């Protein structure tokens, strides 16, 4: 398999270099991946690269977004709370439904890992994905929560790697550390949620 990574760091609206540091930390921890870092891309630029990666059956792909997130009124009626989650991009908002639909349409890659360290980053609802096989979703907080930052990194990204050892994520410890920031990380693997488990094995 060919290991490919796409990491998006949106530095505007006061986030600064912390989100770039988050992206680079993932790249540093995954040296076996050939990674691309996109700083403040347009929605089209980001999605074009993502589609090119997930459409190839030989690829193992990790897609990470480090950005602002927000909620807007749900127009399609598919959200229980009446709100859609969005990634704030340079040229506008990317709604969760559009991103999920795009992944469902083009995904042919062997394995896909989605990482989001953004506010309201329950943006990836595993129930909305058609194919759960070899799909891992790791997000920094639940839909109604915000993601906090330390000076140089996002709280979630830094604590994620502090709690990840030898292929195993200590979910209990990660939750404990982020509880102080009022963040509830969301972890789903192959269609099963591990939010309240002690630990989970993650394949990168």
Please place each PLM-identified region on the residue numbering.
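Cysteine endopeptidase catalytic domains of the caspase/legumain-like
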Residues: 1-204
């Amino acid at each position: 398999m060919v290991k490919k990574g796409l990491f998006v760091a949106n530095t505007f609206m006061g986030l600064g270099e912390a989100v770039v540091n988050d992206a680079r930390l993932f790249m540093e921890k995954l040296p076996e991946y050939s990674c691309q870092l996109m700083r403040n891309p347009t929605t089209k630029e980001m999605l074009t690269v993502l589609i090119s990666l997930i459409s190839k059956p030989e690829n193992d792909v990790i897609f990470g977004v480090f950005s602002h997130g927000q909620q807007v009124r749900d127009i399609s009626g598919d959200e229980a709370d009446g709100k859609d989650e969005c990634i704030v991009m340079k040229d506008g908002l990317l709604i969760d439904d559009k991103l999920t639909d795009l992944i469902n349409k083009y995904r042919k890659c062997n394995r896909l890992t989605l990482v989001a360290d953004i506010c309201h980053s329950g943006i990836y609802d595993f129930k909305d994905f058609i194919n759960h096989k070899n799909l891992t979703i790791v997000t920094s907080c639940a839909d109604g929560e915000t993601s906090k930052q330390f000076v140089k990194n996002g709280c979630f990204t830094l604590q994620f790697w502090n709690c990840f050892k030898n292929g195993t994520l200590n979910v209990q410890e990660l939750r404990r550390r982020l509880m102080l920031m009022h963040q509830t990380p969301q972890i789903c693997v192959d269609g099963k949620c591990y939010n309240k488990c002690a630990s989970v094995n993650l394949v990168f």
